[in-house]
Amino acid sequence: MITTTDFGTLCDGRTVRLYTLKNDAIELSVTDYGSTLVRLLVPDKNGKLTDIVLGYDDLAGYVADDTCFGNNVGRSANRIGGASFTLNGTEYKLAANDGENNLHSGPDSYSKRIWDVAAKTDTSITFSLESPHMDQGFPGALTMSVTYEISDQNEEPALSITYEAAPDQDTLISMTHHSYYNLNGEGSGNILNHKVTLAADFFTPTDAASVPTGEITSVTGTVMDFRDGRYLGTDIEDSTLQTARGYDHNWVIGTGYGVPHKVLTATGDQSGISMDLSTDYPGIQLYTAN
């Protein structure tokens, strides 16, 4: 089922709403402010519902937030070096909001806008956003949507997040979902004892400003090798991670691009909650909230 409640009011008087979807195995709360995921509750090893994402209790927290808690980031996530890019022979200038670089498409973020509710059912909700030509500095008008859907097949809680984007000309589109997960439960401490298995043979190195260098490097023999499972805290102080102050890197998904398949498993050491992540994207960013 789905319920709707008021989540707060913006300074211009617009009302923001919170939508909660639940079934026997999972409970999800999302808001039309940024199409943001606010709460995600699943049962721990004792059957207790546990919120496994970080977030705020009210709208004011999200208005002030600059950490992208639960946001859908776009039009282009992560960093664009020099806050500019060239497409079809034309150079486009973006806002430099991370030193000389553009981060998460700049300060005029999709996460600070009210999205329309395009559709909803007992188990899903779709938000949509119209992004005009040259919005954030990107060419082309864009119709964007994100759908959250919950299920409990075989009594296992599941959440799917689906993006659809329809531009009217060539542009950059690289969306990501930016929830911060703590599988022991939000507020329970750090995630250094979370064990992560990541099916990726390569990663993309970054420079001193965390901008990708354009290289694709093997994970073999490095702290980036999660293929056989690794605790996040094992090498968190390694010298190769000091620029980013931890993990904040992109791993290359070498097979199955375009078809959803499991690429990552993470497990909380206290709760017994384990999360499988599947994607049809060619890359996955692992960030330890440095």
Descriptions of predicted regions:
Residues 1-290:
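An exposed, glycine/acidic-rich loop-and-rim segment of catalytic or binding clefts
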